[in-house]
Amino acid sequence: MIRRGDVYLADLSPVQGSEQGGVRPVVIIQNDTGNKYSPTVIVAAITGRINKAKIPTHVEIEKKKYKLDKDSVILLEQIRTLDKKRLKEKLTYLSDDKMKEVDNALMISLGLNAVVHQKN
């Protein structure tokens, strides 16, 4: 079963403009209820072209810890809904601590941090 925090290889083509494309790693960010029942899944692209977070929506992942080819960055500004048929193979899964970083970057990407601060 596909779970939130899993890292898969996925085929992201075709793309337009600045979208991440080709077969590349993605992290599952959709909740597990959606993962169980929906034919689609929400993912964030991972790139190995940069190995350091450059903006607040980036999360670094280490190649040794996560068995990747190179140090990489999760791009939480590059979120896509994919048909599950685009997922090729599971590579690894992210730790709870790393998923907290993903959640924080996702909140920034979607502007949810402003909503939280306004309620306080």
From Swiss-Prot:
Gene3D superfamilies: 2.30.30.110. One of its GO terms (molecular function) is RNA endonuclease activity. GO terms for biological process: mRNA catabolic process; rRNA catabolic process. It is an enzyme of class 3 (hydrolase). Its EC number is 3.1.-.-. It comes from the Bacteria. InterPro entries: PemK-like, Plasmid_toxin/cell-grow_inhib. Keywords: Endonuclease, Hydrolase, Nuclease, RNA-binding, Toxin-antitoxin system. Pfam families: PemK_toxin (PF02452). Forms a complex with MazE which is no longer active as an endoribonuclease. Toxic component of a type II toxin-antitoxin (TA) system. Ribosome-independent, sequence-specific endoribonuclease that cleaves mRNA, thus inhibiting protein synthesis and inducing bacterial stasis. It cuts between the first and nucleotides of 5'-UACAU-3' in single-stranded RNA. Neutralized by coexpression with cognate antitoxin MazE. Belongs to the PemK/MazF family. This is Endoribonuclease MazF. The gene is mazF.
